[in-house]
């Protein structure tokens, strides 16, 4: 009887411990999940802001940027795959306390992303018209999209670095810096877009080129 009572007390204690652990886990997971959701939302809004604000320029400009961003989306998918793989490896070795390996993994990923960025940059900067002809046969849309794509291609050189680096930071539990970075990037993008579209602060009205330039500035600040 005494052994049974002792075993029952141990079971109750273990169950309470598991419940506490579950609560702690859910609390910790929520503190990580919400900022990451916010970061992804803001990162998407940076691209959406271009399209929405181009609606104030013309429907042609808005259509051109949307089609040009299809090319950018391909690059973003490559970044996303690399960032996901890098973050998994970084989290694994960070948990082991092997910071040197984490640095090597991050360095290798950044070098690969730079090579990919350079390839996409060269193609979009030298052949923007050929890229736009894949998505449309409208001369006006091709002209506006080519202008937009040629300028925004400079953002590729910075976007890969930030995407992989911030994904790696999230994987080791450092979520504040990526959150602040994305918020600053969104604010800079909207401010620059408005300035170049409406000619604020004495700046020239650059239309579709101005929106692309605003995105480049936002990516540099990011």
Protein language model regions, located:
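Interfacial/gating helices of multi-pass transporter permease domains
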Residues: 31, 54-73, 139-144, 208-210
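Helix-terminus/linker motif at the lipid-water interface of multi-pass membrane proteins
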Residues: 41, 45-63, 132-139, 195-206
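Short membrane-interface helical motifs at transmembrane helix boundaries
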Residues: 119-150, 198
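Small-residue-rich hydrophobic transmembrane alpha-helices
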Residues: 62-125, 159-178
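Residue-level signal for short hydrophobic patches within transmembrane helices
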Residues: 22, 26-45, 49, 71-78, ...
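Residue-level recognition of pore/gate-forming positions within transmembrane alpha-helices
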Residues: 36, 44, 70-73, 108, ...
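Single conserved hydrophobic/aromatic residue that forms the stacking wall/gate
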Residues: 1-14
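Membrane-interface helix-loop junctions in multi-pass transport and translocation proteins
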Residues: 187-221
């Amino acid at each position: 009887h005494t052994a049974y009572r002792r075993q029952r007390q141990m079971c109750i204690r273990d169950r309470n411990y598991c419940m506490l652990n579950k609560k702690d886990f859910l609390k910790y997971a929520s503190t990580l999940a919400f900022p990451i959701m916010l970061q992804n939302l803001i990162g998407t809004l940076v691209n959406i802001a271009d399209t929405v604000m181009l609606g104030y320029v013309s429907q042609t400009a808005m259509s051109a940027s949307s089609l040009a961003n299809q090319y950018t989306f391909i690059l973003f998918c490559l970044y996303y795959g690399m960032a996901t793989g890098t973050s998994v490896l970084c989290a694994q070795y960070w948990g082991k306390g092997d910071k040197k390996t984490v640095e090597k993994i991050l360095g290798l990923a950044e070098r690969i992303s730079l090579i990919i960025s350079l390839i996409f940059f060269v193609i979009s900067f030298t052949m923007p018209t050929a890229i736009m002809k894949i998505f449309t046969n409208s001369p006006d849309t091709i002209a506006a999209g080519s202008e937009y794509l040629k300028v925004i291609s400079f953002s590729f050189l910075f976007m890969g670095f930030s995407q992989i680096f911030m994904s790696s930071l999230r994987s080791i539990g450092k979520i504040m810096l990526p959150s602040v970075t994305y918020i600053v990037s969104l604010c800079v993008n909207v401010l620059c877009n408005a300035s170049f579209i409406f000619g604020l602060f004495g700046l020239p009205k650059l239309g579709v080129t101005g929106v692309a330039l605003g995105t480049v500035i936002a990516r540099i600040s990011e």
